[in-house]
Amino acid sequence: VSCGQTAVSPTPETAVVSQAETAVPQPTATEDPATATPLPAPVMATAVPTDTPSGPTPTPTSVWINPTPTVDPAIPVAPPPPEGSVVQPPYAASDCSDKYPCNEDVAAWEARIQVPPGFKVTYFARVDGQPTTMAFGPDELLYVAVQAGTIYRLNKDGVPGAYVGGYTTPTGIAFHPITGELYVASRAVEENVNGESVISIVNKGRIIEGLPCCYTFYHAANGIAFGPDGYGYVGVGGRADHGEILGTNEQDELHPYEAAILRFNDDGSEIEVYARGIRNPYDIAWDGNGDLWATDNAPDFGPPEELHRLVPGAEHGYPWYDCEVCFQPPPGVEVLPPDYTFVAHASPTGITAYTSGVFPGYYNTLFVTLWSAFPGAQSVVAVTPNGDQYDFSLGYAAPVDVIVGPDGNLYVADWATGIIFQISYIGE
């Protein structure tokens, strides 16, 4: 292994659920969501992930959590839109400026957000705080996590109510497709150095702890999704910009689970690496073909941001791909390039695959939020199944997540304003 990286012997790890519990209380949801309609029993996965190297590893646990509030996310971008498409309004950095509507100015925001002909934007809701991630529950209501640690539940009219609170920077939430339980990925503490991220189930506590964290606030356990195989999947960010350990100029042994997509049983056991080399996968999503996609924030000094269709067992590049000053890969390592790229510093965050039939011609289109205030971002990008990509919606301050609702509409969360926008199809 070159450039001072410590070799790690590849030995599979099988996590064992701890039987220990503590009396420390966990945040309790104000009310359980409606029970999900039972689905068929999950089938075993056919993909074989890579062996997990030995080293410091997270462990499943039944320790109850007592999370506390905290912190801040990343940003997204895209190529030229099709002719006649949307045009980006001027960016303004503060609430109620001459270019930036007040957060409560519904009419001004609805006029500002641009969408293609045939679509309509509605100011659906606003939550108190900075949204980081969203999920629809089995009750078909929208749940929104904010940076300060609260998860809100919005009623059908968009009125938010606190559902559960006390987490430290929750950046991933997902409902189990059979049990309806809410899974939360968050930090364990606020510190960036020697930090830790965890996965919890609301009203039950932590099921995985000791996950690597943190290069910045959002290099942690982030987006969660349940796969068609019944397993849980989570993206975990790297602990460095381009391979060096935080606070040094040297590359050291990579944590076995950093910069990777992990797969786990729904009780937190049998954690394994599904794919490697994703520097900071803020969100993940399954498409209609059964492929798993991840947004990826590239190193800070300028390479393009990335979007990957994940290949089980593959090495997707970090910390080696498209980086002249980075450490070079060991001999024999095949690095897969990204499937799509965005402009540098766009900060791709949320992703969803459109698998509804409400938007005509959009089935299996990927929608990606570009969170950054850098030129070319602050947008929702469409990536079509035939490979086209363009700005689908513009005018946001910092769009951080996008999701398809049970009604077939898109919902976009703006981190800077706390506004949740609804994009619906009304016809040409």
Predicted regions: what they are:
Residues 127, 137, 176-178, 227-229, ...:
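Structural WD40 beta-propeller signal
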Residues 170, 188-226:
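Asp-box/WD-like beta-propeller blade repeats and closely related beta-sheet repeat scaffolds
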Residues 141-144, 181-185, 231-235, 291-295, ...:
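Conserved beta-propeller blade signature
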Residues 134, 173, 224, 281-284, ...:
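Hydrophobic core register within WD40 beta-propeller blades
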